[in-house]
Amino acid sequence: MNKLSKYLSLIKFSFFQPKHGVELFQTYRQTNEDSKQTILPHEHSAMEIEKCLKSLFPELDTKKDNLLDQTKKLGSDLQTFLEKIKKFEFPSKQQPYPIDYSISESSRLFLYALCKIIKPKTIVETGVAYGLSTSYILQALYENKTGTLYSIDSEFKPWESELMIGSAIPDELKTHWKFVKGSSTEKLNGVLESAGKIDIFLHDSMHTYKNMIFEFESAWPHIKNNGFLLSDDILENNSFLEFYTRKNLKPILLSLLDQEHLFGILKKSEF
């Protein structure tokens, strides 16, 4: 799909789906506003996954190689899925999201390790796409034989569809999954209220300042003591930095291979 076709497709879609057209406009406007922000540096140093886990759980000695081995089959299954959709162009109904439209391997392994260690009962995430990171969370819940993941996502572009949201997730893992269709603006507060206290909140939806701050502020009161707030792409704007500074929290920053992205980790400790 060339740029002109993509543009015309968006106009037509917005005309017949005005609600999604509003979402598209809000995304564009917020992204444009964020582009004018001066991104402030984080004073805390980023760490590799093993150091992050050691910082959180000093009594454990979790190795990345062991995590890779434990998730080897899942990783292989997800790679097979990605290879199948690579033959289609982006954007299209068959490939509605870019192939690299997911959090990094280190982030996925961290999610898996965290869920294996703390054995959460309730997790809420925003943003699913193909469901790669979702699969790593669900793999841990499947092995734990307990826990529920609530995932919120929507399709608001003409080449997106509910069918492709979470399409990479292996069927056997879906017993621990509850998908909620809609934007986080519409659905997050309702999901949090019905879920009660949660162990983990993960932001991985629209990475704009306004949306991220909204999600952090909404989720934080619902997170249990010793629970976690996690966020991908914290260098997109200053929301994560401002949030933990205002709350007087010490973040843990997971470094990623490309060094242009960071995964943010906040542990809630009230006592």
List each language-model region with its residue ranges.
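Generic hydrophobic, helix-prone segments enriched in Leu/Val/Ile
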Residues: Y7, L24-F25, T31, G75-S92, ...
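Class I SAM-dependent transferase core
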Residues: D61-E105, K116-I117
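Prokaryotic Sec-type signal peptides and long signal-anchor helices
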Residues: Q17-H20, R29, D61, I85, ...
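Charge-dense, low-complexity intrinsically disordered segments
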Residues: K36-M47, K54-K72, P98-Y101, K178, ...
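Membrane-proximal basic amphipathic "stem/tether" segments
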Residues: M1-D61
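S-adenosylmethionine/decaboxylated-SAM
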Residues: K3, Y97-F271
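Exposed alpha-helical structural elements
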Residues: K3-K6, H20-E23, E48-S55, K63-K73, ...
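Residues that form generic nucleotide/phosphate-binding pockets
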Residues: L56-E59, Q70, K84, V191, ...
